[in-house]
Structures are given as C-alpha cells and as structure tokens.
Amino acid sequence: MQAGKPFIPADLTPLFHAPIYRELKESERLRYNQLHALYFNEQIMYFETALGRPILTALLRQEWPDRLADGLRQFVAEELRHTEMFRQLNRRCAPHLYGERDYRFVEVPAFWTAAMRWAVNHPLSLPLFLWLMLLQEERSLYYSKAYLRHPSPLDPAFVEAHRLHLADEAKHVRWDEELLDALWLRAHPLLRRVNAKLFAWMLEEFFGAPKRAQLRVLDELARELPELRGRLPEMRRQVLALSRDEAYRKTLYSREIVPRTFARFDECPEFRTLSLCGYQPQSTGG
C-alpha cells in the first residue's frame, strides 16, 4: 500500500459532489477517499456474497445447455475469487478495521439478511435479481475502467485489483444477458410488472444515492480525524441531500455507465413507466 495515494477516483465518491468537499484540507480529502474505497470494496463483496453466488447456485439446480451451465459454474468460481481478492486488499490496507471481520461500513439488519437469503433462492419467481446483477456488473465495468484511465496515480494495489475484476466482468455481463433472455421474457407479464416494481424499490433503497453505509464512512473519518467532528453533521446533511440532486444521481447510473442495461429497459414496457435512478426511456425505434 502507498499511504499517500488515493485508492479510488475522487469523482466516484459522493462527498466529492458536495460543496463542503472544497473546504476540506488535502489530507482530509485523501483519508475520506481511502475510506470510501474500502467501503466500495465491501459493497462488491456483499453483492457477490449475498446476491450473486446464491442466485447462480440456485440457477444451477435448473437444466441449462451445457455451454451456459459451464459458464455459470465458472461465474461462481470467479465471484469467489473476487470476494477473496477484495477481502484481502481491505485487510492489508486497514487491519484496524478488518482484522476480525469483512464489513465495517455495510451493515444489513438480520431481517433483511434472512429475507434476501430466501429471495435469492427463488430466481425463477424473482428474476428481478438478474436485472440487479446485470446493472451492478455493467456498472462495475465502468468503475474498473475509471481506475485504469485515471490521469493521476492511484494506489497500485487498487488499480491492479480492479484490472483483474474488469477482466472477468465483461463475461459476467454477457451471461447475465443470456439469463435474462432465458427467464425474463418467458415470465408472465404480471410477474414481470411486480418484479420491475420490486427492482425499482431495491435499487433506490440499497444501490442508489448515499444512505447508511456512506454515513458510516463519514463517521469513521471524523473518528480518525477529530478536527472534523464539528463538521460531521454538515457533511452528513450534504451527502444525504445528494439523493435529490439529479446530476449526482446520473453519476451512479446513466446510459454512459450502464448502456446495455438501459437499452434493455427501453425494450421492456414494465420498466419504461418506472422512476429509476438516472434512467429516462428512449424510443427503441421498432
């Protein structure tokens, strides 16, 4: 690790988009950047552990063409490898935060953990999770590329981790699309409408604008840098206010970030009528 280098492109962090960021010292910005990057790694780990692998394991209980079944097994193995890579990276960077646990900022209540565990084991009835996988993995492609093209030096361990992540995610996006083609279009229209509404809610609640975990990042920043404690309430307020900032929301999801997912939304009437972060329907020209 190189303690003096940022871990993530600054524009991928929410506080960068808040006015108070310009008032922080360079050292304060740097430590915030590093803490947010650790949280971002946690988010990848949680998504792959709580959603990705269980969904794929459940799908492998179904009959698939040999080529796709082999792809799904490879998908599971690669998700395991990614999780371990980001776990070890966080532990090397911040042993005081991760010495005996994997998550410092991502905290999911027991009720939601149990509900999610049940839901992801029923991907045929709840194919919304395939949309979440496609959306998040296509977004990961964009983020990993941002690490590689960043003009100023980032910590090389983080750049290398995202280079390796990028190498697999392109395949994962293709497999996600194949699964959607196989399961979504054959589902009953009512099931698709219900799943689309659940998807919109989950996206806003867990994968949208800053909420609980990002506030814990700010809390840790103020704990490590006591001179920021007086500013903590205002930092929290401004970060939460980003949920109403449409320009910021488009930095999370847009046609530049997730073009294939949004193009598929355009083709599905059940998504075109929903309010989704960063999404505005376009004509498919059919």
Where are these regions (language model features)?
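Non-heme di-metal
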Residues: M1-G286
